[in-house]
A protein has these predicted regions:
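Short, contiguous strand/loop micro-motifs
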Residues: 13, 42, 85-88
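Alpha-helical elements of the RecA-like P-loop NTPase motor core of helicases
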Residues: 11, 47, 75, 119-120
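Acidic, PIN/NYN-like endoribonuclease modules and their adjacent C-terminal/linker elements
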Residues: 1, 100-132
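A general structural signal for well-ordered alpha-helical segments in protein cores
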Residues: 23, 42, 52-55, 74-78, ...
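Short, well-structured N-terminal submotif of metal-dependent ribonuclease cores
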Residues: 1-37, 46-60, 128-132
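Active-site neighborhoods of divalent-metal-dependent phosphate/nucleic-acid chemistry enzymes
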Residues: 65-113
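Alpha-helix capping/helix-boundary segments
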Residues: 8, 41, 73, 98-99, ...
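A short helix-to-beta-strand connector/capping loop
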Residues: 62-64, 125
Length: 132
């Protein structure tokens, strides 16, 4: 099972400059198995793009499923955000930690543009960067 980060899906849904690379990465991931989006990524998409029903319908049409966070992922996300805030002085949004922890503990990989962040805070998580 492979998770997808909200900015990656937003790029595709808005036909951004990297949409072709995202489409290729998603197609390859779908050929290999189930592709999912977690609660935090779904909420980010609904907040930034369209209403929730349209976002969910678009994801379902692409073959992307919803995968809720388990408590272990939520706890890891909180721990990693606290660590990041202590190191850098200000915290990144909790949603990026929720997405990373979900991918690490509940999935096999994450499709993301932010490989450096995820490598730093989610050691061992396999990353797929569209276009790389």
């Amino acid at each position: 099972m492979i998770a997808v980060d909200a900015p990656v899906l937003a790029e595709l849904l808005t036909d951004g400059p990297r949409a072709d690379a995202v489409e290729t990465a998603l197609r390859q991931a779908l050929e290999g198995g189930r592709v999912v989006v977690c609660d935090a990524a779904l909420a980010e998409l609904a907040a930034s793009l369209r209403n929730g029903a349209e976002v969910l319908a678009a994801l379902e049409e692409m073959g992307i499923h919803f995968s809720p966070l388990e408590s272990k992922s939520a706890l890891r996300a909180g721990e990693m955000q606290r660590r990041q805030r202590q190191r850098e002085g200000r915290a990144r949004p909790l949603s990026v930690f929720l997405t990373g922890a979900h991918a690490l503990l509940q999935c096999d990989a994450l499709i993301t543009f932010d490989a450096a962040f995820h490598r730093d805070y989610f050691k061992g998580l396999k990353l797929v960067v569209p276009g790389d």
